Amino acid sequence: LTGNLYHPGIRDLYGLQCWIATLIILGGIGFPILFNYGKLVNHKVRNLFYRLTGSSKRMPSHVRIVNTTTRIVITATLLLLVGGTLLFWLSENNNCLRGLPLRGKLAVSFFSAVTPRTAGFNTVDLTSLLPSTWFLTLLLMWIGASPLSTGGGIKTTTITIALKNIINTLRGKEKIEIFKRQLPSENVRRAHAIILLSILWIGTATCLVAFWVPEGSVTQILFEVTSAISTVGLSLDFTSQLNTAGKIIISLTMFVGRVGLITLLSGLIPRQSSQSYTYA
């Protein structure tokens, strides 16, 4: 459709937007999470059947099915959905949401909080958004979806672990605990490495595109690069202005975002065998 989901024929179909948003959320949660909850529902149904039939059999409880990763993903997803919806509504209430009915404002705000994290659809004119909303959309694109899902970004688990580590550092705590479970130090190092590499790549790609395509504003270029590395597809009407060099940089950024910087660099840089050191 011309204009994406902002097409005049469908942009007021709020029910359709909610259905699409639901599918986006399910795709962005990750297949292991969906499998875990499917398994949980299956076990609860079977336990109910066993109780009704008087059988002594019992399936494992949710404690062993819904693990720490699942809880992190669900909690982070809910916070991003609720927070993103409220912030979009507050930011655009007197701008692009003006004149819409209450259900329309809620549907558009909810959809606009969902789609930047993985899908790339839009039901509003992105170029008419306020700078605060651009920054919100950029942040949601950068965070992205969850591990082993259809979305990109640095992932919800990465940002959660990094934020928890910052909080613990400020409190003077050495161990990282989430939901009463201690996280391995390797996970913490990996989370910070992913964030740092992502910021470095976005900054470098933004500078290169700005050099080769000087007619673009910094906001447009940064938005385009972040959308590319998170494999989202949103743009502030800047993609058509890219020349050959700009297209190559954006294409390479999309490839890196899809494969993952850690994965890509791990394949290019040989692993060093562990060595033991003795300190005097």
Model-predicted segments: where are they?
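Membrane-proximal intracellular helices of multi-pass ion channels
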Residues: 1-280
